[in-house]
């Protein structure tokens, strides 16, 4: 038997229902915030991620699915969504005009890492990217969008925020941090590598010993220039005004190299201690990194598998939907196919091609999670009627075929 690859999972039944629910909710909220859909390729040139995600990141260093294709191109399966969207933005020369572009995306991402609960080698993300707006109010709106999504999905969260500063204030902080790191011994190999490539990433290390060494490290948000400080204060003010609880985490850095200024992360204890379920921030430098005109960008990405795990833990019930249409005698099936064809213009209809007893049909309708049950037997056929049962409300009656649209 051929099985799915390790760390890759089929989505069906309850998983598929939860996936559809999450995507539908995210899309509705994103559209309400003025975002439109973008779809980018799963396969990109490796250079895109080496320049955007950064050579010092674990993604590029350890986790990319990369290979040489038949055209001798060094390509990889996308490990994250932002870089591809920025590439599309630049390729279409949208960086050359002054209009704001707001996009949302969803789909598969690929990273070769150890599979665990809520983390797979092929995983799914929903994300948004906003280009051309420098205002911190755009950062706040994107955070509020996530708050609304989690509210609709009934997911409890803790919001962490920080400011990573800008090109004006970061060089001095970087200098202070390197001086601090040089004064300490015992950092892991990853931290030593990051110290030379991008020292701020050392703060992101998950090693407990390294974190203990960082207890008295200089803080990002205490080294901000006046402009970054003002924006960070506005961000906190907006969140408070909108009733959003948050915590300033001075050691929060995004795992990717292109972030600046606003950084945020949503964590949940519903699938394990402090599991990240979404994160993002501002990345004004990324467009320029990828040969675009210097501009502004901010966005987030959400891990769908972790959201599904939370929903399933809550025993999320699959809602009944659609119509189950059936016959007790094979001679009525052709007539029912005609009825089903008309109903399918407005409704989801599952038509059974087998003649069965009423109890068997009802059992099958229940297995298929249908909301409405319609059946034709000899008596119904003679009266141009159908037996109707609402499986959610447990209501049943005889209805005329001519009244079907009105009843449904």
UniProtKB/Swiss-Prot annotation:
GO terms for biological process: histidyl-tRNA aminoacylation. One of its GO terms (cellular component) is cytoplasm. It catalyses: tRNA(His) + L-histidine + ATP = L-histidyl-tRNA(His) + AMP + diphosphate + H(+). It comes from the Bacteria. InterPro entries: aa-tRNA-synth_II, aa-tRNA-synth_II/BPL/LPL, Anticodon-bd, Anticodon-bd_dom_sf, His-tRNA-ligase, HisRS-like_core, HisRS/HisZ. It is an enzyme of class 6 (ligase). GO terms for molecular function: ATP binding; histidine-tRNA ligase activity. It holds the Pfam family HGTP_anticodon. SUPFAM superfamilies: Class II aaRS ABD-related, Class II aaRS and biotin synthetases. It is found in: Cytoplasm. Keywords: Aminoacyl-tRNA synthetase, ATP-binding, Cytoplasm, Ligase, Nucleotide-binding, Protein biosynthesis. Its EC number is 6.1.1.21. Coiled coil: none annotated. PANTHER family: HISTIDINE--TRNA LIGASE, MITOCHONDRIAL-RELATED, HISTIDYL-TRNA SYNTHETASE. Homodimer. NCBIfam families: hisS. Belongs to the class-II aminoacyl-tRNA synthetase family. This is Histidine--tRNA ligase. It comes from Campylobacter jejuni subsp. jejuni serotype O:23/36 (strain 81-176).
